[in-house]
């Protein structure tokens, strides 16, 4: 869930999200250092009355302010590229989940099992239980095993949607006629909430996503009950 006053990122539930948070903190530290340096130089220029009447050019300072930003950009670009490749890497999945975006709900199919598919609608506010979350709870949750490599295939039936779960560091566009995929690894049990992150019409904000992460033995029981029912 979001933190107080929407400050900061959600607690990570996957190794990829942990890496994203580390990169965010790394880049933010560099930006703070740049801001402090530029602010200090501006302050000194405003309150320094000394001038050099004979200064026509300064090759040394020009080299410094050309090379230094390039080095700083390298310190940002290298971790960013590393993380970009990590996010695109597809490992051998244990389970494949297919998600289809509609106006304005999600459909899910467990491709590795027969006849396990369902639609997931937002629960209206007047039907919520006392411990429910407004605009975030759904009637049918996605149930996935923790500590397993999961592949998700995302597409759409009408307009462009985007399947997004911040705690997992996952955001995949669902485009009609196209199949996009990514993978993630949930490292703890719990409920993880997401929403459609692409404007898709009047009820765009009413397309929540809820993942219930459970131990593998509970997931197997859930699959067995779903197949038998």
Swiss-Prot record:
Top-level lineage group: Eukaryota
Free-text function comment from the UniProt entry: Component of the cytochrome c oxidase, the last enzyme in the mitochondrial electron transport chain which drives oxidative phosphorylation. The respiratory chain contains 3 multisubunit complexes succinate dehydrogenase (complex II, CII), ubiquinol-cytochrome c oxidoreductase (cytochrome b-c1 complex, complex III, CIII) and cytochrome c oxidase (complex IV, CIV), that cooperate to transfer electrons derived from NADH and succinate to molecular oxygen, creating an electrochemical gradient over the inner membrane that drives transmembrane transport and the ATP synthase.
Cell compartment(s), UniProt: Mitochondrion inner membrane
Membrane side Mitochondrial intermembrane: residue ranges: 1-26, 83-229
Subunit structure of this chain's protein: Component of the cytochrome c oxidase (complex IV, CIV), a multisubunit enzyme composed of a catalytic core of 3 subunits and several supernumerary subunits. The complex exists as a monomer or a dimer and forms supercomplexes (SCs) in the inner mitochondrial membrane with ubiquinol-cytochrome c oxidoreductase (cytochrome b-c1 complex, complex III, CIII).
List of residues binding Mg(2+): 198
NCBIfam families: CoxB
EC number: 7.1.1.9
Pfam families recorded: COX2, COX2_TM
Catalytic reactions of this protein: 4 Fe(II)-[cytochrome c] + O2 + 8 H(+)(in) = 4 Fe(III)-[cytochrome c] + 2 H2O + 4 H(+)(out)
Transmembrane segments: 27-48, 63-82
Family: Belongs to the cytochrome c oxidase subunit 2 family.
Cofactor dependence: Cu cation
GO molecular function annotation: copper ion binding; cytochrome-c oxidase activity
This protein's GO CC annotations: mitochondrial inner membrane
Segments on the Mitochondrial matrix side according to the record's topology features: 49-62
InterPro entries linked to this entry: CcO_II, CcO_II-like_C, CcO_II_C, Copper_CuA, Cupredoxin, Cyt_c_oxidase_su2, Cyt_c_oxidase_su2_TM_dom, Cyt_c_oxidase_su2_TM_sf
Root EC class: translocase
Keyword tags: Copper, Electron transport, Magnesium, Membrane, Metal-binding, Mitochondrion, Mitochondrion inner membrane, Respiratory chain, Translocase, Transmembrane, Transmembrane helix, Transport
Keyword Ribonucleoprotein attached: no
Primary gene name: mt:CoII
Residue numbers binding Cu cation A1: 161, 196, 200, 207
Protein name: Cytochrome c oxidase subunit 2
Residue sites binding Cu cation A2 per the record: 196, 198, 200, 204
């Amino acid at each position: 869930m979001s933190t107080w006053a929407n400050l900061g990122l959600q607690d990570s539930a996957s190794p990829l999200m942990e890496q994203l948070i580390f990169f965010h903190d790394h880049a933010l530290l560099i930006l703070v250092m740049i801001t402090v340096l530029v602010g200090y130089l501006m302050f000194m220029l405003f309150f320094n009355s000394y001038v050099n009447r004979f200064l026509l050019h300064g090759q040394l300072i020009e080299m410094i302010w050309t090379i230094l930003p390039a080095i700083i950009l390298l310190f940002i670009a290298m971790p960013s590229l590393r993380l970009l490749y990590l996010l695109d890497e597809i490992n051998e999945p244990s389970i494949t989940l297919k998600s289809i975006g509609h106006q304005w709900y999600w459909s899910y199919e467990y491709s590795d099992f027969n006849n396990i598919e369902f639609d997931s609608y937002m629960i209206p506010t007047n039907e919520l239980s006392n411990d429910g979350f407004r605009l975030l709870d759904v009637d049918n949750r996605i149930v996935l095993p923790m500590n397993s490599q999961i592949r998700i295939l995302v597409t759409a039936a009408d307009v462009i949607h985007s399947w997004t779960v911040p705690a997992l560091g996952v955001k995949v566009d669902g485009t009609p006629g196209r199949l996009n995929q990514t993978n993630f690894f949930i490292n703890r049990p719990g409920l993880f909430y997401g929403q459609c992150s692409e404007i898709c019409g009047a009820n765009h904000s009413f397309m929540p996503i809820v993942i219930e992460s459970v131990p593998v033995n509970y997931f197997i029981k859930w699959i067995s009950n779903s197949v038998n029912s």
